């Protein structure tokens, strides 16, 4: 390469290197970015409401947990297999119970089961957060 043709290449390479260093989240695993979305979906699902729960809303919230969880778990599976598997199992249990909820009467019948599963989900989520904290900070 001649001196004139190398200059634009080097300029582009320098800009790319600077951008890679200064962009937030660069160098962090993919699951780190996905933790925020999953946390938000779990918080929405487990938030206490003063109005009677609507099975349709609950199922929408469960679907959001499932979608965000699947993306995050798939990204973390190779680095944190036991925590990912525990979280995946907890999400799957909540999803399976959610599929049985079509009326408020269904919610009354399965409310205790769902509440216990949400506690398990929260525990698995806390373990996952603890395990991935160093990689994501």
Task: Describe each PLM feature range.
Residues 61-125:
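Long, amphipathic, charge-rich alpha-helical segments that form helical bundles/coiled-coils
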Residues 24, 30, 132-134:
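Extracellular secreted precursors and ectodomains with disulfide-bonded cysteine-rich loops/domains
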Residues 124-137:
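Short, low-complexity, Pro/Ser/Thr/Gly-rich segments in the mature regions of secreted, periplasmic
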Residues 26-70:
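Immediate post-signal-peptide N-terminus of mature secreted/exported proteins
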Residues 1-24:
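Sec-dependent bacterial lipoprotein signal peptides
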